[in-house]
UniProtKB/Swiss-Prot annotation:
It comes from Geobacter sulfurreducens (strain ATCC 51573 / DSM 12127 / PCA). InterPro entries: Ribosomal_uL10, Ribosomal_uL10-like_sf, Ribosomal_uL10_bac, Ribosomal_uL10_bac_type, Ribosomal_uL10_CS_bac. This is Large ribosomal subunit protein uL10. SUPFAM superfamilies: Ribosomal protein L10-like. The lineage of its organism: Bacteria, Pseudomonadati, Thermodesulfobacteriota, Desulfuromonadia, Geobacterales. Belongs to the universal ribosomal protein uL10 family. Keywords: Ribonucleoprotein, Ribosomal protein, RNA-binding, rRNA-binding.
Length: 174
């Protein structure tokens, strides 16, 4: 690769690192093509970009970004997974793949919204429910008191009508 190509790659990678909500690093030593293709397809379906990048280019690209703390992990074969939208789904795919391929794919570290996270943190992130499920639970929690209040308000007139009806039936019976 000539110098201009490297500079262009560094600039593109720098832009991607700045836009990414989460970045995960992995060691892919010993992976075969079939395994790599499977991982790429799973990550693509989760809207995650996966690249194998030279460590020196990655170190240059990470400068002046909130992902610069990852530079201590730029050793050996390094793959980078960039999540621009949902970090939980990216962590789920990577964590699951690391469990199924423990000898060939190992997570190194990550950055989530500017903060460095360990492999254990990535696993914890993977154990979270998806964003949609969390939003649904939150909305259900917010909606529950309102629904109960409406039920109570509806019960008061209903009770009043039933009481009036009982009085009417009692008077008609006499």
């Amino acid at each position: 690769m000539n110098k201009e190509t490297k500079q262009q790659q560094v600039a593109e990678l720098h832009d991607k690192l700045q836009r990414a909500k989460a970045v995960f690093l992995a060691d892919f030593r010993g992976m075969n093509v079939e395994q790599a293709t499977t991982l790429r397809n799973e990550l693509r379906s989760a809207a995650v970009e996966y690249k194998v990048v030279k460590n020196t280019l990655l170190e240059l690209a990470s400068r002046d970004t909130d992902k610069e703390s990852l530079s201590q992990h730029f050793a050996g074969p390094t793959a980078i997974a960039l999540s621009y939208d949902d970090p939980v789904s990216a962590a789920k795919v990577l964590s699951k793949f690391a469990k199924t391929q423990p000898n060939t794919f190992k997570l190194k570290a990550g950055v989530l919204t500017g903060k460095a996270i360990s492999v254990a943190d990535i696993q914890s992130l993977a154990d979270l429910p998806s964003r949609e499920v969390l939003i649904a639970k939150l909305l259900g929690t917010i909606n529950a008191p309102v629904a109960n209040f409406v039920g109570v308000l509806a019960a008061v007139p209903g009770s009043f009508v039933r009481a009036l009806n009982a009085i009417k039936v009692q008077k008609e019976g006499n």
